[in-house]
Amino acid sequence: MDTRKIIHVDMDAFYASVEQRDDPNLRGAPVIVAWRGKRSVVCAASYEARKFGVRSAMPAVQAERLCPHAVFIPPDFPRYRAVSKSVREILLRHTDLVEPLSLDEAYLDVTENKTRLPSATEVARTIREQIRQELNLAASAGVATNKFLAKIASDWRKPDGLFVIKPDEAIAFLTPLPVERLPGVGKVMTQKLTEVGVRTVGDIRNLDLAILQNQFGRYGTRLHELARGMDNNPVEPNRPTQSISAEDTFESDVLLNETDATIRRLAEKVWQASRKESRIARTIVLKLKTAEFTILTRSHTPSSPVSSFEELTIVALALREKVQMNPRQRFRIVGVGLSNFRDPIIESAEDLLFE
């Protein structure tokens, strides 16, 4: 049995909450953090805006239609990074085993905690109180014996909540959950599972491992483990992101020249994610999967780091043109990614050397 004590801390509507904290006029108002424009996407939405159906990564024009009276605020990433640093300093008071996932969430391994608090639940409660008292922001937290369960737990009582999944209660907790609550289970996989009568995590647990592996390959093994509350992945402090990518599965297979809008949307999503993590990338990657499940990748490394959403989009579309196939070939998945990251500090120093 896993005896670790893992906490997942997730700042509630982080960017929007920072804006509301710093401007009293925004408190209680629906706030959408996004650039205005036809191709922009929502970076964050306050809970007041979410009541109208606004969600992160939604096209900004759609968000404006759903909530026309919302206040649109352009993102201020330097300010968010500064607040995120303050949050991390609070987390590090309790353990050195802190794995940031983004500016607004992190995993902590508090199996041994610096403050000698008697339980992981007490550590999580203290962290939330310190964030509230020192930064005037709300955070949700989940406590469990592994990262997978802790993440589900932190979502359970949002916003501004704390939830604990005890080891002997994990299976009972997971059993009735819909399959889409499992990481990696999107619309397409949910549909495939539904077609074979699988709708809940408990249904997955009742399937033989061989059936899951036959249907979903290596991820079938992962589903088998998750349905049993198993996750051996360690908390990895300072683990660098190797790549940032996004992909989409079409409802029906499409021709190559019908992928423009999807590539642009994915490029916007990837660019926003790289900005959120303050990452500087040198390589742009395009991924395509044919209707016959053949995977094609094309990449390009410009002479200087990728500097804008427009550059990312132009290069991704150009990479598509390098795909030489029968014009009648159809595709089921397209993806856009950034990789070959550089340290922003080193990059800035190198730029200065050559000015």
What do these predicted ranges mean?
Residues 1-215, 219-222, 338, 342-355:
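Gly/Gly-Pro- and Ser/Thr-rich, intrinsically disordered tail segments characteristic of DNA damage-repair
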Residues 8, 181, 189-333, 338-354:
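DNA-contacting surface of Y-family translesion DNA polymerases
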